Amino acid sequence: MEIIKTVVELQTALLKIREQNKSIGFVPTMGALHRGHIELVKQSVVENTISIVSIFVNPTQFNDKNDLLKYPRTLNADCKLLLQETNNHFVFAPSVEEIYSETNIQQFKFGHLETVMEGKLRPGHFNGVAQVVSRLFKIVKPNCAYFGEKDFQQLTIIRTLVRLLNLNVKIIPHPTVREPNGLALSSRNIHLTPKQKKNAGMIFKTLSKSRKEKNILSIQELKQKTINKINCIPDFRVEYFDLVDGNTLQSITDWKDTKYIVGCIAVYIGEVRLIDNITY
């Protein structure tokens, strides 16, 4: 596995691969890799001739400078994990200057998609995500790019970005990877105490149980019941829970509004904020 830090180096390495019409799989990450990332990389390796993982802590998607400063930067450990667990070919670990070399930063408009849920609570976040992903796509020019379904709103934004820019890349979602108790894997989980981590499995268990009440309870009743159940757990506070159309992210008010219904939730456990989702 080769570690590359400049755009020129990467594009030189990929030139021969493209000339031979070999498929390139790409997994963009911010590092602090866990088993969820590893599963994405394994899929990329299996489905493509060459697999590339980018490790880049993107400053434009952080609303809080302290969050940016505190975000773990563990390149050596990440590369070691990739070597141990996957047959990945390249790691692209550029500097901020390498990615944002030009001063003109493109602004993206995603309309309703970026004004609800995570977008409402983190203004500008998805524009920052789009800025870095669009740049990485133009540098790597992958055939396929892999994203986890845990960040469902982000996945929807990325699909829209590809359409807006008319990019020739296939976006491949990967099911959320979970702990045995149902907790969705996240880099933030390391901040949970053992007791909090054990209780955190109740988020997905509660969502799963709520799915059985589809068409029995009204949308509003199901949302309120789910919120109340989770808020009853010590140290838990639901920030939002909404049932949305999986394509448009529009809130639904009736089970007949769409056949593709996704329940999206954000929960604080103490000071740790977790997100999850489930399809109804």
Curated annotation (Swiss-Prot):
Keyword Cytoplasm in record: yes
Keyword Secreted part of the UniProt annotation: no
Residue numbers binding ATP: 30-37, 148-151, 177, 185-188
Matches recorded under NCBIfam families: panC
Further remarks about this protein from its record: The reaction proceeds by a bi uni uni bi ping pong mechanism.
Family annotation (PANTHER family): CYTIDYLATE KINASE/PANTOATE-BETA-ALANINE LIGASE, PANTOATE--BETA-ALANINE LIGASE
Name of the protein in its database record: Pantothenate synthetase
